[in-house]
Amino acid sequence: AKFNSKILLQRVWSVVYNKGDYHVPHNHSSTGYCGILYLDMKPDSPKTTYIQPWNNQEDKSVLYTPQVKPGDIMIVPQFLMHYTTPNTINFKKRILSFDFVLEPVLF
């Protein structure tokens, strides 16, 4: 299949989670997608949890916390609520966050 869209970055920023840092539930209000590139973290670093707009059929949960490692990228629709639990360890978790839209390419 051929991908006939351009990726247009809207915003890019870095986040460093020091001990005690966290993010409250939020979404990214523009249309499009948001992504996280995990740069530096430990297995017990704080996790990003997504709040699903539907119940998981297996366990009826609306929370999804992917197990990620450095180098992983998560991309979700910008309307999806998400948060990060507090950093309880003495290690700085580093991520690169970005928002983007897809622009169709016309031939």
Functional labels for PLM-detected ranges:
Residues 5:
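Catalytic phosphate/metal-binding cores of nucleic-acid and nucleotide-processing enzymes, i.e., regions
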Residues 1-2:
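Short, well-structured hydrophobic secondary-structure segments
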Residues 8-75, 79-80, 85, 91-95, ...:
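Catalytic core of non-heme Fe(II) oxygenases with the double-stranded beta-helix
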